[in-house]
């Protein structure tokens, strides 16, 4: 087959006309150094703070330092195989995690990927991990309770929906136990829970997940894990990821509770990243913005008003407020609450539950110190019956502690002082509670009623908890309607007071404890 010159030129023209050039603009850079999970990238223009940078092998790094001729980024995952000269690409996106009800009952990592072996999560939505907190106009005052199930907390240091209540104390004195019991107590309350484990041993986290499952609370809970073996970047980001998952419920008129266990380890991870990025260190070698690290996280816990929810859902949800309640945990060293991170978080939160080593070792568990524990807003959210009955509990305990200190120096005490000491001892004994045994509103109200009205005065100290158990068992059997009414409404009036008095008198007459 022979082609003449005209046909050849026509064929070439045809090919040129049909040729399509597909060009793609890529923001590319080159790795110039790798050390301890920090990479420096040259040539990556137009990158923003917190942008995800795609690395070879489907991994990502987070841009944190934007310098004149390079970008400092922290690798989210293993980095041993990264080398100088490798090409990286800017994505133009900031980190987002999957959110929604599909995550309930699952254990995920910081990026929202399942790590519980129960298959993929079919989440329909994602949300940025860094979000600006709701403004002043969008918020509503806290006036609904979060029942933790602990007598000592719900009576003296009440927590409201949308509050930030710090749990602070030394290691191994029950901080996590208190938070986990609070989550277990929400299984029938309509409050969704998020538990964020930061820098903990994998075995400890597995035990927490097992306990939540055993007590039927895992189905309403999302567990976010950044264990001690994870990179510092993932430990630093885990609380923000968990918060984004909680905000999904808050912004749709639901209530959620989030536990950060613990923010001390997050601050240490952030300090590690900052020092490796050569940011100037400050007090205790923490960077200058460690306060902002926690304030921008905890300010996202709030109660938002009906207008905010309606606007956010485009009118789909009307007349409902939403809330995200935060229980951050801080570990102190030898009870030093004046260290840098503890004082920061105390100043950000709406109160603190202080757990004391001396009380824990003395067998008072939960080891809540009522003297320096406080709730700045929860009082207005307290259940009515608990608020009415528990007014004297804190006073009795404070007076008992003060008198007990003086009583050590004096043997001849007057009758009034002896009576006050005896009452204080019994109230302290009554505040003890076993782990994984949260109490209902009725159980707490009846126990406090018995203590406040002097029904424990003739009960021996070592029989106080037996008396309580027998009283509650009797009440649930003989006064089931009253128990159901108080659990449902939390109301208190003269009629309920008379019924509680009759109940306790009837029980005392049986002498069965």
From Swiss-Prot:
CDD domains (alphabetical): ATP-synt_F1_alpha_C, ATP-synt_F1_alpha_N, F1-ATPase_alpha_CD
UniProt catalytic activity: ATP + H2O + 4 H(+)(in) = ADP + phosphate + 5 H(+)(out)
EC number: 7.1.2.2
Keyword terms: ATP synthesis, ATP-binding, Cell inner membrane, Cell membrane, CF(1), Hydrogen ion transport, Ion transport, Membrane, Nucleotide-binding, Translocase, Transport
InterPro entries from the UniProt entry: ATP_synth_asu-like_sf, ATP_synth_asu_C, ATP_synth_asu_C_sf, ATP_synth_F1_a_nt-bd_dom, ATP_synth_F1_asu, ATPase_a/bsu_AS, ATPase_F1/V1/A1_a/bsu_N, ATPase_F1/V1/A1_a/bsu_N_sf
One GO CC term on file: proton-transporting ATP synthase complex
Record site feature (Required for activity), residues: 373
Principal location class: membrane
Subcellular location: Cell inner membrane
Pfam families: ATP-synt_ab, ATP-synt_ab_C, ATP-synt_ab_N
Membrane topology qualifier: Peripheral membrane protein
GO MF entries: ADP binding; ATP binding; proton-transporting ATP synthase activity, rotational mechanism
Residue stretches spanning the membrane: none
Binding-site residues for ATP, renumbered to this chain: 169-176
PROSITE patterns: ATPASE_ALPHA_BETA (PS00152)
Self-association and partners: F-type ATPases have 2 components, CF(1) - the catalytic core - and CF(0) - the membrane proton channel. CF(1) has five subunits: alpha(3), beta(3), gamma(1), delta(1), epsilon(1). CF(0) has three main subunits: a(1), b(2) and c(9-12). The alpha and beta chains form an alternating ring which encloses part of the gamma chain. CF(1) is attached to CF(0) by a central stalk formed by the gamma and epsilon chains, while a peripheral stalk is formed by the delta and b chains.
Entry's family note: Belongs to the ATPase alpha/beta chains family.
Its job: Produces ATP from ADP in the presence of a proton gradient across the membrane. The alpha chain is a regulatory subunit.
Name of the molecule in the record: ATP synthase subunit alpha
Organism of origin: Vibrio alginolyticus
Lineage: Bacteria, Pseudomonadati, Pseudomonadota, Gammaproteobacteria, Vibrionales
């Amino acid at each position: 087959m022979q082609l003449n010159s005209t046909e050849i030129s026509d064929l070439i023209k045809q090919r040129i006309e049909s040729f399509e050039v597909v060009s793609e603009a890529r923001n590319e850079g080159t790795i110039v150094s790798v050390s301890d999970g920090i990479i420096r990238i040259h040539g990556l223009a137009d990158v923003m703070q917190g942008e995800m940078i795609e690395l070879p092998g489907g991994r990502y790094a987070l841009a944190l330092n934007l310098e004149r001729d390079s970008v400092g980024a922290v690798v989210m995952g293993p980095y041993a195989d990264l080398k100088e000269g490798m090409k990286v690409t800017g994505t133009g996106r900031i980190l987002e995690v999957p959110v929604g009800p599909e995550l309930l009952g699952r254990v995920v990592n910081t990026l929202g990927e399942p790590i519980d072996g129960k298959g993929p999560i079919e989440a329909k939505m994602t949300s940025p991990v860094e979000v600006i907190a709701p403004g002043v106009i969008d918020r509503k005052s806290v006036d609904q309770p979060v029942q933790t199930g602990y007598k000592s907390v719900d009576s003296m240091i009440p927590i409201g929906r949308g509050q930030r209540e710090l749990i602070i104390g030394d290691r191994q004195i029950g901080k996590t136990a208190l938070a986990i019991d609070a989550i277990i107590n929400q299984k029938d309350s309509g409050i969704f829970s998020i538990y964020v484990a930061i820098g903990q041993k994998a075995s400890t986290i597995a035990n927490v997940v097992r306990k939540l499952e055993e007590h039927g609370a895992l189905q309403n809970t999302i567990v976010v894990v950044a264990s001690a073996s994870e990179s510092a970047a993932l430990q630093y980001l885990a609380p923000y990821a968990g918060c984004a998952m909680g905000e999904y419920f808050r912004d749709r008129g639901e209530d959620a509770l989030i536990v950060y266990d613990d923010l001390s380890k997050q601050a240490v991870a952030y300090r590690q990243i900052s020092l490796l990025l050569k940011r100037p260190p400050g007090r205790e070698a923490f960077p200058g913005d460690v306060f902002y690290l926690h304030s921008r996280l905890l300010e996202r816990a709030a109660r938002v008003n009906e207008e905010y929810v309606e606007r956010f859902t485009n009118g789909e949800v009307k007349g409902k407020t939403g809330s995200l309640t935060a229980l951050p945990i801080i570990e102190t060293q030898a009870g030093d609450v004046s260290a840098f991170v503890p004082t920061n978080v105390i100043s950000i939160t709406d109160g603190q539950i202080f757990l004391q080593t001396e009380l824990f070792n003395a067998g008072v568990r939960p080891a809540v110190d009522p003297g320096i524990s406080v709730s700045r807003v929860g009082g207005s959210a307290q259940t009515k019956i608990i608020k009415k009955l528990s007014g004297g509990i804190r006073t009795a305990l404070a007076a008992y502690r003060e008198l007990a200190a003086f009583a050590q120096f004096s043997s001849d005490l007057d009758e009034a002082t002896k009576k006050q000491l005896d009452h204080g001892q019994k109230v302290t004994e009554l505040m003890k509670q076993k782990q994984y045994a949260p109490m209902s509103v009725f159980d707490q109200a009846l126990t406090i009623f018995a203590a406040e009205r002097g029904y424990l005065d003739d009960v021996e100290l070592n029989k106080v908890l037996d008396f309580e158990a027998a009283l509650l068992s009797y009440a649930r059997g003989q006064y089931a309607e009253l128990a159901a009414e108080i659990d449902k409404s939390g109301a208190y009036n003269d009629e309920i007071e008379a019924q509680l008095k009759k109940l306790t008198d009837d029980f005392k007459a049986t002498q069965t404890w």
